[in-house]
Amino acid sequence: PETRQPASQELESPNPALRHTALERLSDLDQLQTIASEDADSGVRAAALGRYQLLLAGKATDSPPLADRLERLRQDADPQLVDFLLHHAVEPELRLVALEQTTAESTLIEIAVHDPHMDLRLAALERVDEPESLDQIARQSRNRDKRVYRRARERLDALVAEKIRASHIERLCTEMENL
């Protein structure tokens, strides 16, 4: 069923309360994005941003199809939007695309330990490179998720082995220079 879009006169009303109410029926992502950045009233801007995020996350009955939302996310790499979708998007596919755009180590750790979907937990884990972070993930997932725990331990052990190997090579080079 087609949802009723608000009349443009409601969206252009000088009354912020009327514009705010009209946003609840608006599903045009471009228009919401424009209102979120340009409306004179901060409450209307915040409501437009909230509606935009809700639609992109797939939490509204009138959300666009997943393919459209995936494309929009790939085009709009706003860190706040990416973070919102990573935590609130309905479909794991959308959260996975958001994860690909995330660089914050703390967010990657949180997803690796707490996300309800195994694929996202493992994908987040693979993006973590710091030994301390891998150790934290291993400790926090030890009794909850054996696959994540094992993979974190494997990666941590590999990093430690590489560090030992590099230090051994450096020591050998120093010894050879001293001959």
Residue map of PLM features:
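Alpha-helical scaffold segments
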Residues: 1-179
